[in-house]
Design a protein with these regions (language model features):
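Alpha-helical residues within helix-turn-helix
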Residues: 14, 24-25, 53
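Conserved binding/catalytic microenvironments
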Residues: 108-208
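A short, Lys/Arg-rich alpha-helix, primarily the initiator
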Residues: 1-18
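Short, charged recognition helix plus adjacent turn
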Residues: 67-94
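Short alpha-helical DNA-recognition segment
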Residues: 19-38
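Residue-level detection of the helix-turn-helix DNA-binding "recognition helix"
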Residues: 17, 31-32, 41-43, 70
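DNA major-groove recognition helix of helix-turn-helix/homeodomain DNA-binding modules
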Residues: 49-64
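Residues that mark the N-terminal boundary/hinge immediately upstream of a DNA-recognition element
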Residues: 11, 22, 47-50
């Protein structure tokens, strides 16, 4: 699995020992003993099926394991996304800082969401400094142009839509939020989705 670092095996070994689980317990007759041993020594990476099995045996989510593997921190991308979603949208210095970090990230990676963040920080900086919402909306349009073509929205897209909803004209914001709330219904049992839904409704009420 290419998305996991070379330290997966060492992390797996450390967690297993901390939990006082045996290799036999982890493998549970689903993974050959020799295969499991090679994974802990970072000689091979797990298949997707084995990876999911190991997460289940560790009683962990993928997010928690990745957090541990990254020295108990979020990835660079997740840090950018979290910083953007949590900031005060009139904090120009912080907006500029996030924008610069996003541009540096894009020097190394091709990433649609981080590109969206650059556009949105541009829009928010303009709005905070000049109050010109028409000019700010020009920077939002490329983001919406990409998102509206998608066959479905997932949590990260829904978070982006929520972040920029107040920049749309009211009639468009009503339509977009309605579509977004319908998409969120698919996540009815997901704890984070409820927060997005509440925030979407709150932001829409502020526009009305």
């Amino acid at each position: 699995m290419d998305n996991h670092s070379a330290g997966f095996g060492k992390t797996l070994l450390r967690i297993r020992k901390n939990k006082q689980y045996s290799q036999q317990y982890m493998a549970e007759n689903k993974i050959h003993q020799s295969t499991y041993s090679k994974m802990e020594r970072d000689l091979i990476e797990p298949t997707l099926g084995n990876y999911r099995h190991l997460l289940s045996r560790l009683d962990m989510s993928d997010e928690e394991l990745q957090y541990i593997m990254n020295d108990y921190n979020h990835s660079e991308k997740e840090q950018l996304l979290t910083a953007f979603m949590n900031l005060s949208f009139n904090d120009v210095p912080l907006l500029q800082e996030i924008r610069e970090k996003a541009l540096k990230y894009l020097d190394v990676h091709t990433d649609y969401i981080i590109t969206d963040i650059v556009h949105l920080t541009d829009a928010l900086i303009i709005l905070a400094i000049t109050g010109d919402i028409a000019d700010a909306r020009k920077h939002v349009r490329p983001v919406w142009k990409r998102l509206e073509k998608l066959d479905g929205w997932y949590l990260v897209e829904l978070r982006m839509i929520n972040a920029m909803l107040f920049l749309f004209p009211i009639d468009e914001a009503i339509l977009i939020s309605g579509t977004a709330l319908a998409q969120i219904q698919k996540y009815v049992n997901h704890p984070f989705a409820g927060k997005i839904a509440v925030s979407l409704r709150h932001n829409l009420c502020l526009l009305l």
